Amino acid sequence: MFKETFAAALLLTFSLTANAGFVKTDWKSSGDSLSVLHEETGKEWLSLTQTDGMSINQVIAQLGNGGTFDGWRLPTASEVEVMLQDSFLGFNLKTGKNTYMAEGYNDAYWKEADTYRKQMGGTDYRVVDGSYWAHSLGFHLDDTGTQLQNSGMNHFNWKATPRLYEFNIMNQVSVDSNNWDASSTYYGVYLISDGGTTLSSKLDPTLNINNPDAPINNVPVAYLLSGLGLFFLSLRRKQSKNR
């Protein structure tokens, strides 16, 4: 209870936004925008562009100390579900393939598709003879850690005149082959961090404060209190000087 109260005080003190959303962060270098923070959960997702074309097994081999994806982990299906639901508010997603059709030159779902593609990273984008395909899809495992699934979205038009658009939101769709060595140019692999992996979260650990498993929430309370006390002391001194 005390830790929760203290975390709330930190949120107010440093004026972090209370609105749930997705904000680009930097993974390795300033300005690379290769990760995204889900503010509501305090967890960060790696851009699918970094795992595009890889299999689950290839990614697993690069997790852990010294690997390409050191500090990242595979998300649970429940974490993917929360991310998808917050990405597509108002769609009332069911588990499986959610399909939406639109006809005419006013593409009803372009905004949602483009936002997600930019947010999570595009895994394929092509324009051929007036038709286009946009994919942002990723492999992950179900909550038992045994079944290969895919989630994300694809958006394309079937024909040019009249235009017929199809928008699919994939929510934990099981891969029939369950082959962990399967890979595709249309798919990446979802990776998530609890904090302290990206450059952004190293520079500002409070980015992950909404995640109870974040490093900032595992710092001894006495240490945090001393830091907060110094902050308020310096604030009081500044106020005294201005009187």
Named regions from a protein language model:
Residues 69, 78-164:
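An exposed tryptophan-centered "aromatic clamp" motif
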Residues 31-91, 185:
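Short aromatic-cysteine micro-motif
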Residues 216-236:
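A short, hydrophobic C-terminal helix/tail in secreted or cell-surface proteins
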Residues 1-4, 237-241:
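Positively charged n-region of N-terminal signal peptides that target proteins for export
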Residues 176-202:
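Short, structured beta-strand segments at or near domain termini in extracellular proteins/domains
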Residues 20-30, 202-209:
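Boundary/junction segments of secreted and surface-exposed precursor proteins
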Residues 15-18:
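N-terminal signal peptide c-region/cleavage motif recognized by signal peptidases
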Residues 2-8, 221-226:
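Sec-dependent signal peptide recognition
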